[in-house]
């Protein structure tokens, strides 16, 4: 049994990742009270920052992985981007709930014809010997004209993101979402990488 430590405290990410990395010989541990300031300028920098921080906390002796992801909108100069989680504070200087954050995006996009957007995910894995590998995933879609208040699936910007088949991410259950999402694609690459060493 190989134990991997996941550098996150986001319960939604944990649930998605545990379903994708459902490998019999892999056990995923979540560190308690893990909270690192994301000061990188790219998803990759932030992902590496978190992985390296946890690797150090575990005395450079345990395999760790982290991920950073976000929504990039062409008409908004690829924002929210790395500020996706804290776009409210970056843009308005105050904290908003999820619905309010989605409203902010809808308002900013009100006059925009180009609604093309991307969800991007970067995973950083550090093995026990300190070797680093990165895995990326991207989902292309568009920003909806309004918010889906009724679907209970997904989190964050899922209620305003339309996939190429015109379905909101919030309409998909976890299994459906993981097949096409940025996180699903990146973690599928990571899973295949891990499987090489478990045979």
Curated annotation (Swiss-Prot):
Cofactors demanded by this protein: Mg(2+)
Catalytic activity: XTP + H2O = XMP + diphosphate + H(+); dITP + H2O = dIMP + diphosphate + H(+); ITP + H2O = IMP + diphosphate + H(+)
Active site: 68
Cofactor binding summary note: Binds 1 Mg(2+) ion per subunit.
Disulfide bonds: none
InterPro entries, per database record: dITP/XTP_pyrophosphatase, ITPase-like_fam, RdgB/HAM1
Keywords assigned by UniProt, alphabetized: Hydrolase, Magnesium, Metal-binding, Nucleotide metabolism, Nucleotide-binding
Domain of life: Bacteria
Binding positions (Mg(2+)): 68
Residues annotated to bind substrate: 8-13, 69, 155-158, 177, 182-183
Biological processes, Gene Ontology terms: nucleotide metabolic process; purine nucleoside triphosphate catabolic process
Known EC number: 3.6.1.66
Coiled-coil ranges per UniProt: none
Enzyme class: hydrolase
A Pfam short name: Ham1p_like
A GO cellular component entry from the record: cytosol
GO molecular function: dITP diphosphatase activity; ITP diphosphatase activity; metal ion binding; nucleotide binding; ribonucleoside triphosphate phosphatase activity; XTP diphosphatase activity
Protein's job: Pyrophosphatase that catalyzes the hydrolysis of nucleoside triphosphates to their monophosphate derivatives, with a high preference for the non-canonical purine nucleotides XTP (xanthosine triphosphate), dITP (deoxyinosine triphosphate) and ITP. Seems to function as a house-cleaning enzyme that removes non-canonical purine nucleotides from the nucleotide pool, thus preventing their incorporation into DNA/RNA and avoiding chromosomal lesions.
Protein name stated in the entry: dITP/XTP pyrophosphatase
Gene source species: Borrelia recurrentis (strain A1)
């Amino acid at each position: 049994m190989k134990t991997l430590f996941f550098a996150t405290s986001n319960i939604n990410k944990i649930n998605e990742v545990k379903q994708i990395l459902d490998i019999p010989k892999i056990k995923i541990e979540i560190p308690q009270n893990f909270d690192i300031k994301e000061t990188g300028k790219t998803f990759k920098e932030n992902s590496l920052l978190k992985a390296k921080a946890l690797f150090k906390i575990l005395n450079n002796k345990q395999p760790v992985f982290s991920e950073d992801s976000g929504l990039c909108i062409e008409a908004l100069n690829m924002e929210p981007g790395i500020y996706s989680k804290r776009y409210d504070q970056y843009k308005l200087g105050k904290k908003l709930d999820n619905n309010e954050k989605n409203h902010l995006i809808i308002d900013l996009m009100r006059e925009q014809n180009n609604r093309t957007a991307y969800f991007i995910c970067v995973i950083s894995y550090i093995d026990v010997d300190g070797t680093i590998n990165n895995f990326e995933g991207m989902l292309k879609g568009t920003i909806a004209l309004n918010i889906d208040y009724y679907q209970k699936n997904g989190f964050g910007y899922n209620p305003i993101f339309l996939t190429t088949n015109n379905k909101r991410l919030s309409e998909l259950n976890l299994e459906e979402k993981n097949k096409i999402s940025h996180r699903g694609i990146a973690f599928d690459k990571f899973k295949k990488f891990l499987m090489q060493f478990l045979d």
